[in-house]
């Protein structure tokens, strides 16, 4: 059966094939040769899917390393290159600018060359960007490297959650989807840890490693079966799905469900911006954009990018060590969320997370406000400093339990297959634009008023509670096709 009869599609698929098959072990596995006994190696579907997720997780690790790099290196880079606070703020935020450009292209790239091909393309500017930073003598190479990193990360941030959602069985999709954000936090923690001991130029060279490992790893995993089905590559689609579910698993029901979904989408004309006004399109897009925007407006990236500055203003002497401690806490909390998301559900974790962030940020804001009226030599000042640090850590924990991993997961789940490229690009672009806005203003807002900055973030998190309770659907335990049917 072919999902598309257009002859031009066959020509396009010929161009895509190098991204699909070159060196892919699943092509050997599909032959089930007695010599290789591939089915014995990957019989357990959970092992097969987990292996794929762990390989693509190198992309989010790169994402996190980019986010975490600017915090431990601020003092050294500004000293070595003679940068002002404003110039370093520009450097810190330029990854977001590059990511916006990458986000615009991400949907179309992932739709044309597939999820694997998209990640291969994203890895190249990341590698070049890190090398540019490591050899920078002035702001030009520094800024160029940060932009290139951002471009690659913008593509990664869309492609990885979509790929994971499309390969994961419904019972594991929440946990596996949360691995995306868990990997981001691991990347951040590694940047914080290595930043304690390694000069900033060497740290930039180490930033090359995730994508350097990702490129060969992609040759050993199958392409997304849903993307293959959409492209009309029927044999490849069924082969990929069989490998992901195990060679002894009956995939007939899932194959037919995906075929029906793709056939239904293929009957519709290409979606344009004007078509997004229909509820089946605008509502999931609104939910996806809303969650991803509120994730950033809550200030988490501002806190992470400039955590050393925040701890210094709180009176912590070893601010970089404290920042690494926050990174460890973030990894642990995100790991807990990964375990809970398919048990407790998405909505409950989002509610707990946003409420916890609101309370934590209010505590931090009050502590900073009160410090203005207390002598720096008093015990009360030290107590308030510790309260503000505890509040920041509590905010990071709360975010990691829900608002960190789940918005990307829900975005990858709720967007209809025929608008996923367009709508996913829009949602990812808005996320990175707001991230840039928060990152660009965080240092200046903290210099203006630490208490005022955290008050603004707290108000946003309070609104997030309302947004989740009114508009975010529960997707736990549903197939992607069942989720999309909710909006019809």
Swiss-Prot record:
Q: Enumerate the InterPro entries for this protein.
A: MFS_dom, MFS_ERD6/Tret1-like, MFS_sugar_transport-like, MFS_trans_sf, MFS_Trehalose_Transporter, Sugar/inositol_transpt, Sugar_transporter_CS
Subcellular location(s): the record lists: Membrane
What keywords tag this UniProt record?
A: Membrane, Sugar transport, Transmembrane, Transmembrane helix, Transport
Instruction: List the membrane topology term(s).
Output: Multi-pass membrane protein
Chain segments annotated as transmembrane: 47-67, 90-110, 116-136, 147-167, 179-199, 202-222, 285-305, 321-341, 348-368, 390-410, 426-446, 452-472
**What Gene3D superfamilies does the record tag this protein with?**
MFS general substrate transporter like domains
Which protein family is it in?
A: Belongs to the major facilitator superfamily. Sugar transporter (TC 2.A.1.1) family.
Protein name as catalogued: Sugar transporter ERD6-like 4
Q: Which organism is it from?
A: Arabidopsis thaliana (Mouse-ear cress)
């Amino acid at each position: 059966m072919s999902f598309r009869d257009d002859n031009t599609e066959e020509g396009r698929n010929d161009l895509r094939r190098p991204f699909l098959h070159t060196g892919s072990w699943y092509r050997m596995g599909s032959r089930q040769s007695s010599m290789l006994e591939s089915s014995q190696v990957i019989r357990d579907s959970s092992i097969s899917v987990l292996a794929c997720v762990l390989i693509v997780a190198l992309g989010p690790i790169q994402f996190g390393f980019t986010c975490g790099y600017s915090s431990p290196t601020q003092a050294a880079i500004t000293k070595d290159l003679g940068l002002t606070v404003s110039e370093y703020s520009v450097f810190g935020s330029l990854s977001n600018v590059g990511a916006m450009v990458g986000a615009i292209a991400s949907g179309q790239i992932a739709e044309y060359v597939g999820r694997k091909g998209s990640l291969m393309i994203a890895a190249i500017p990341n590698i070049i960007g890190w090398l540019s930073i490591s050899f920078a003598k002035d702001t030009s190479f520094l800024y160029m490297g940060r932009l290139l990193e951002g471009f690659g990360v913008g593509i990664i941030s869309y492609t990885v959650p979509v790929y994971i959602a499309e390969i994961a069985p419904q019972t594991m999709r929440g946990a596996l989807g949360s691995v995306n954000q868990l990997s981001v936090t691991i990347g951040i923690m590694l940047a914080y840890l290595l930043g304690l001991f390694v000069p900033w130029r060497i740290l930039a060279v180490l930033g090359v490693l995730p994508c350097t490992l990702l490129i060969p790893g992609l040759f050993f995993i199958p392409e997304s079966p849903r993307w293959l089905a959409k492209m009309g590559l029927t044999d490849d689609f069924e082969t990929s799905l069989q490998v992901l579910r195990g060679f002894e698993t009956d995939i007939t029901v899932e194959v037919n469900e995906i075929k029906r979904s793709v056939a239904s989408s293929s009957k519709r004309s290409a979606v344009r911006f004007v078509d997004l006004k229909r509820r089946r399109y605008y509502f999931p897009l609104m939910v996806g954009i809303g969650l991803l925007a509120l994730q950033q407006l809550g200030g988490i990236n501002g806190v992470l990018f400039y955590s050393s500055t925040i701890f210094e203003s709180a009176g912590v002497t070893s601010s970089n060590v404290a920042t690494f401690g926050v990174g460890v806490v973030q990894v642990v909390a995100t790991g807990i969320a990964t375990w809970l998301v398919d048990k407790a559900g998405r909505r409950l974790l989002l509610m707990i997370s946003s409420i916890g962030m609101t309370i934590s940020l209010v505590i931090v804001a009050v502590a900073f406000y009160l410090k203005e009226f207390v002598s720096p030599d008093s015990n009360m000042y030290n107590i308030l400093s510790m309260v503000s640090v505890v509040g920041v850590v509590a905010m990071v924990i709360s975010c990691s339990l829900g608002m960190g991993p789940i918005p990307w997961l829900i975005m990858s789940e709720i967007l209809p297959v025929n608008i996923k490229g367009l709508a996913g690009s829009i949602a990812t672009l808005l996320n990175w634009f707001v991230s840039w806005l928060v990152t660009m203003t965080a240092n200046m807002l903290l210099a203006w008023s630490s208490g005022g900055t955290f008050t603004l973030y707290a108000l946003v998190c309070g609104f997030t509670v309302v947004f989740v309770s009114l508009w975010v659907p529960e997707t736990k335990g549903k197939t992607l096709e069942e989720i999309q049917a909710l909006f019809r």
